[in-house]
């Protein structure tokens, strides 16, 4: 009996030692260029926001894993914005505010589908941004990936999903011909009266009553900042970001 107890105690000590070693190794390397986080994010080199007037925030889970805005990159290249993540990040301009009835849209081009990840990662636009840059930040985003699927999710400030746990397929969403091939999506979010509609490549893919999006645990309002949303480990060019009352 004593021998069995000693074996159990010894095994427990070994397990605890391994867990401590793994924790310390993770703590040492998380956040540096090329390092992983709990969600598999890999920090980019020469990161940060390189365009005046732009702001950003990485997801709370990424922050807890040691990631910062310097682990992702936003730069201007010609007429397009070039975003490389890194941690899952939201970007917005200081003066990008929309209220009432409006449409926010942008064109996203992934020049080499899945070149930074092992599975499709989405990108898109967000609206309803409030308390920006703080732990209470709220937003609703519609994002697509190059496998013909999309998600509608948000922060209130904790994450919430309007499309369930998994992404949804829709024939309107473009599919890349293969890994490393280009794919482009036109993505918009529109507020019209009591409805909020996500459209991709000119077709409505999701529509919600505003009352299901605003309230405790969700948006403060559909009014607020608008901007761009990227999952972790993406490499995307963005053009024609705009808000209109049409």
Residue ranges of predicted features:
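Short, aromatic/His-centered strand-loop micro-motif at the edge of beta-sheets
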Residues: 159-186
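Secretory/extracellular carbohydrate-interaction modules
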Residues: 84-161
